Amino acid sequence: MKKVYLTLIALLAVISASAQGWPANYNGVMLQGFSWNAYEAAQWKALEAQTTEFKGFIDLVWVPQSGKCAEPVQVMGYKPYYYFNHNSSFGTEDELRSMIKTFKNNGIGTIADVVINHHNTEGWFTFPAETYKGVTYQMKSTDICKNDDGGKTATQAQKEGVSLSNNNDEGEDFGDCRDLDHNSANVQKVVKAYLKFLKEDLGYEGFRYDMVKGFNASHVGDYNTATGIQYSVGEYWDGVGNIKNWINNTGKKSGAFDFPFHYNMTNAIRYNDWRKLYDACLMSDPSYRQYAITFVENHDIQVREDNSNEGNKDPIPTAYIPAANAFMIAMPGTPCIFQPHWKAYEHELKSMIEARKLAGITNTSSYNNYANNKQYFANAVNGTNGRKLLVVVGIPSMMTTPSKTEYTRILSGKNYMYYLSNNSETAWADKASGTYEEGFETTLTAVSKNSNAKLVYTTNGNDPTASSTQATSGTSINISSSCTLKVGLLINGTVSGIRTYNYSIKRFEPYNITVYVNTDAVNWKKVNFYYWGNIDKPDWPGTPITQTKMIDGKNWYYKDFTITQKGGMLNFVFCEPNDAGTKEKSQSVDITGINSTVFIKVGPEKDGGKYVVTNVTKEVNTGIDQPITENTGKNVNNAWYTLSGMKMNQKPNQAGIYIHHGKKVVIK
């Protein structure tokens, strides 16, 4: 009995530790992997393709709500409908699983956007029934708050003879959906099953809870304890005192976004007074900075093309985006970088993150104000092993330069500078590892107490030695091709503090793809392609397609497209137009994230009145593996085919890729 008791105690301790809200001494950096209505950039395939660039810099990626919604058009997911079906506007469930798995294999966790304050319905009161692992889960009308939608729901319920919960909403109301009563045993059962599915089945490692002002914080604590989730952050949009109260009421089982940190930054910029960074925020309190997820901009505050957030809009002016991020990344708390900022300043942000990690800064690090006035603000942040990172924002040139015996400048940009304490004893290059589209210069710096320290470096991946190429601190070297740069300190004939930088130089070249569509199952007599993304979209119902090819005994409508930019993707709807070509008779669901040649079959099943499609590219190319190279000098008599499946009369003489013996063959 005693053994069983001790086992239970140990199990409870493990659960408690894993539901601590946010780990202490955490040195990771998070990326918000989306912005408002930017569907192409947030496709699961697009995010997964960036894994190599994220690795070593980004530790967590917060992605959009991944469950399938009821709307027949692309949506951001904030009106959830299905909990266990994760085919969404951002890709298929298979693509989602692949992304999460790839991230995890590279040391990157995925944060789910969890929207449980409210739920969409068919009509006023019908929730979907979903079966998972043999158990059917479904919300009932009695799970809807009694005063939902300002009493409109109760009025409708009376008309339809439907019962609601006896409990009023615990917080703010969301008018477009039904607000859930989290005191309902059924709601708790469904939500806990959903969250366990996200963590244990899909592989999410953390939750971002949307609109937590809508229900009591205690429920977040309960859900996190039941799930054993490691990372939890709530969107409690309020002042610092109320955010702290919310964290306390979760049982300190969740972190929270540091909205005051954001407003301190925008106020400093707006009023041209950098002393406003002194103002209190979650990160500034040593007792709460563990739970502070800092950010400078997000999808609710950014400028939206549709102006749907007019009252909340508070973006960072473009000229100050690097500086705002530099301050955030240097400070304690867990920084969360906004995707548009990452896309625009990736290499610069990587160098900031490298400096943070080199100094050993975590979410619980301490700091001191170094200098300040209206024109500039500087904090010295304490890392590990006595190292410090000094961040200066505003007009850094107006500040007295720190003592060269204490600090060395390692990074500078528009409206910011980074200095690293000399006891770090390390070499440094100011261009971070990653992929670049053209050659560049990187400046090498010796950070050392020894003023006579020099630098040695190699570009072949070997550790530098005392006999390697030497450079003085501040020397810029040219990187013109892909290489591995290793640079170290040289002091009294000994090399130490080696840093490694992996540079890949790949200029993007536009390339062509072909989209093939087969409509045999739906008997369409005409086919239009409607497309959008990194391309001029046609008027609805799209471009008439007249080109066809017979491949594998089937007729395929096809059109060629050009991918014109790095990470570019196209999206499609296929439809049968009316005789006049002015509207559709019937159409497919949306197909998103296309960046390579695909074969797609339409129908016959429907989803929301639209035909479901299947990507059959692998089936059409059955037996076609990776290309092999064959010299044209070989004499082969068997048939040759183009990639589109057209048989050739003889072996091709023109260079290209062909199909031969069931393989892709490169003719040079």
Q: How would you describe each model-predicted region?
A:
Residues 15, 622-668:
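C-terminal outer-membrane/trafficking sorting elements
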Residues 21-36, 46-55, 65-67, 72-79, ...:
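Active-site-proximal helices and loops of the catalytic beta/alpha 8
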Residues 72-80, 118-163, 225:
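Aromatic- and acidic-residue-enriched segments that line the glycan-binding/catalytic groove
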Residues 332, 394-397, 446-454, 521-527, ...:
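Short proline/glycine-enriched turn/loop motifs at strand-loop junctions of beta-rich domains
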Residues 423-509:
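Short, compositionally stereotyped local motifs that mark structural "simplifiers"
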Residues 463-474, 521-565, 577-589:
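Aromatic-rich carbohydrate-binding modules that target alpha-glucans
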Residues 476-484, 563-568, 651-654:
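Surface-exposed, short loops/turns at beta-strand junctions within beta-sandwich domains
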Residues 489-491, 576, 660:
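Conserved structural position at the C-terminal beta-strand
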